[in-house]
Amino acid sequence: MATQALISSSSISTSAEAARQIIGSRISQSVTRKASFVVRAASTPPVKQGANRQLWFASKQSLSYLDGRLPGDFGFDPLGLSDPEGTGGFIEPKWLAYGEVINGRFAMLGAAGAIAPEILGKAGLIPQETALAWFQTGVIPPAGTYNYWADNYTLFVLEMALMGFAEHRRFQDWAKPGSMGKQYFLGLEKGLGGSGDPAYPGGPLFNPLGFGKDEKSMKELKLKEIKNGRLAMLAILGYFIQALVTGVGPYQNLLDHLADPVNNNVLTSLKFH
């Protein structure tokens, strides 16, 4: 009897131990599955920057390289100019983006400078002999010229020399950002060190008012600048077309249109009536 009791007790202990092992194994498997599920959930790829941005006639191909990081990037690139594989390495996409910013700034200055003499002349703020349409100031010699202190050819050579020097310095900074702050330049080199981004050098010379003090405001200002720059480039193109078609300046065109919209508009100027 004692022997049977010992055997029974041993069997019960063995069964209990087996049960604990089975239950423990299942619990361990369950925990492992849950843990592996959590790991898989955490490995979800992040959302691309600018994924929810506004798009203008974007294609699947353009969105493969225009990811919204550049200011004013709406995925619009019908000619594939910014495609790093479409140019065969001949044109660097970063250079195109940089060039758009620079040309936009020149266009904004040009658009304002071309129309300002007309407006100031009409308002009587400057003499009439200097209130000329932009194409009569010497930029297009056959259309007329103003009597400056030197002839047009001398002025052209001088402008080319000055602009060539400025553009050379700008290209040096593009090739090696910050290099202009290391070269002597009339004591101004401290303000030419830049920010590391050639398109937005900042500093006391290029951002004296300290705009864009935080990342959010800087991003908004970059977007506004590129939009206005693109508009200004279109305006300059419009100035050229107006000059060829109407023979008067943009401000005079506006006054003529407001005075008689029916007979002075795009269609009548192009003889589509």
Curated annotation (Swiss-Prot):
Where chlorophyll b 3 binds, per the record, is at 167
| Chain residues that bind chlorophyll b 4 | 170
Q: Provide the residue positions that the database annotates as binding chlorophyll a 3.
A: 225
Q: Where does chlorophyll b 2 bind?
A: 105, 140
Where is chlorophyll a 5 annotated to bind? 224, 242
* Endoplasmic reticulum recorded as keyword: no
Keyword entries, A-Z: Acetylation, Chlorophyll, Chloroplast, Chromophore, Magnesium, Membrane, Metal-binding, Phosphoprotein, Photosynthesis, Photosystem I, Photosystem II, Plastid, Thylakoid, Transit peptide, Transmembrane, Transmembrane helix
What are the binding positions for chlorophyll a 6 in this chain?
257
Amino acids binding chlorophyll b 1: 56
Could you mention a single GO BP entry for this protein? photosynthesis, light harvesting in photosystem I
Entry binding sites for chlorophyll a 4: 228
Q: Which GO terms describe its molecular function?
A: chlorophyll binding; metal ion binding
List ligand-binding residues for chlorophyll a 1: 76, 82, 100, 230
Subunit and partners: The LHC complex consists of chlorophyll a-b binding proteins.
Q: Which family does it belong to?
A: Belongs to the light-harvesting chlorophyll a/b-binding (LHC) protein family.
Domain remark in the UniProt entry: The N-terminus of the protein extends into the stroma where it is involved with adhesion of granal membranes and post-translational modifications; both are believed to mediate the distribution of excitation energy between photosystems I and II.
Put simply, this protein is called Chlorophyll a-b binding protein 8, chloroplastic
> Which gene specifies this protein's sequence?
CAB8
